[in-house]
Amino acid sequence: MWHSLPPPARGVQASVIIPAKDEATNLPATLAALAAQTDLHGQALLPHSFEVLVLANNCLDQTARVVREFATRHPRLRLHVAEIKLPKAQAHVGQARRLLMDEACRRLEQGGHPRAFIASTDADTRVSPTWLISIAAELATGVDAVGGRILMDNADPTCPVRRCQLRDAAYYLLRARLEDHLDPTPYDPWPRHHQHFGANLALTARAYRHVGGLPVVPYLEDEALVQSLVRHDLRVRHSPTVKVFTSGRQQGRVAVGLSWQLRQWAELQQTQREPLVDNPQRLLAEWQLRAQLRQTWQQYSSAATSGALLPLPSWPAAAGLSRAALRRELTRASSFGQLWEKIRGRFLVHTTRRWPAVPLSVAIRMLREQVAALDSRPSAVVAGQLCT
């Protein structure tokens, strides 16, 4: 599939990957945004510093032809396209993005840049002019992956679905602020956001190899990849400076994604119903528990190294655990991310009935009250306190 591509430029730092199925109409704008990449001073990026890989999978239109014609008109852009007909069982974005990321990683390793990274976007998305340089700046701080902001392209502010989307964004940004208060991480400080999706996601080639590549699932493959990174204790930054603009189409190419979410909001608007979302009281308890568990993990790891016997904390019952079960999980886990994934599953079973989902407007009000209260208190008092 990729055998006809020229070798990567020596020292290429970024490989941009774009899965495309019947995207002949949208791709020119997507590619134009990549061809116009600049540094923070407005100077064009060096042509050899990045390349773009497009995989036209199971297309019925002229997607591949459009890419080739664009490449001819923009010879400075290192743009490559491959075509593939995937079997029905594999004809989904997860498989397409995996094939792209695997090839991007291979080429970056061949190029030899020590900080090489894979940058994922979509065929209906326009990246900001400083997208790549902003990703590189975040990765230079030592993080392993970057999730950027995904904004609606030319959205009508009077559209009912648009209003629902803005309220949803407000909810998740308030969540991110609450999480930062309760369990702050030095590599993902505030200001940050909540998104880490395929339209705007980057990770180092080294991190990609470390987790064994992109999980092959029909949809939400981006979420599965981030979960794998977290499970391996790799550092994911949610950067507000890394931005893209995506289409607001309701007929998308995947079973579950932004277009599916927009359709769900439209249906709720038509029936005058509100979305139900996670209860902020449960979120508060969850993140305080995680902060406590993180502290216990660090102490346990140090004690295991020194051979000391560490007394266990008194809070495991809040997660539906006995002390014996907690000690067992601490012994089995090879990373904090793996430990938290197991404990969180038990916590959700233990607390779902206690804190059921609530309407979006109620959740926003609760979060605003929680965040306002925490904003007025010293951070040392907030972090790590367990809510029961």
PLM feature spans:
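N-proximal low-complexity "stem/linker" segments adjacent to membrane-targeting elements
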Residues: 1-49
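Terminal low-complexity segments of carbohydrate-biosynthetic enzymes
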Residues: 266-388
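Conserved donor NDP-sugar-binding/catalytic core segment of glycosyltransferases
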Residues: 130-167
